[in-house]
Amino acid sequence: MVMAKKVAVLAVDPVNGMGLFQYLEAFYENGIPYRVYAVADRREIGTNSGIRLTADDTVAALKGHADDYDALVFSCGDAVPVFARHAGEPYNLDLMEVIREFAGRDRIVIGHC
């Protein structure tokens, strides 16, 4: 019996839609359960090309839940090059905490930028 992996997906605002949707499609096609967490103070985010979408939750809700997932996937976007300007925002502090938590639990942490 093969157990399905469960993945937490982080999406910045704005996110690279092509990258995000490729991840989500691959997970869907392979029967891998996932939840998308917005790296923002709200669930509603956008893609680099202006498409609006609603994530399952925000990154704040992912804190303390690394044991619920096998992997953390970071989906990059135009928000990352200007990260330094917003590094002190609560959602970016939550992002760093979540990455640290997943790494500390020896979870797979992957992404693209």
Please give the residue ranges for each predicted region.
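Extended, subdomain-level signal for the structured scaffold at the beginning of enzyme domains
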Residues: M1-R105
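Catalytic nucleophile serine of serine hydrolases
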Residues: G111-C113
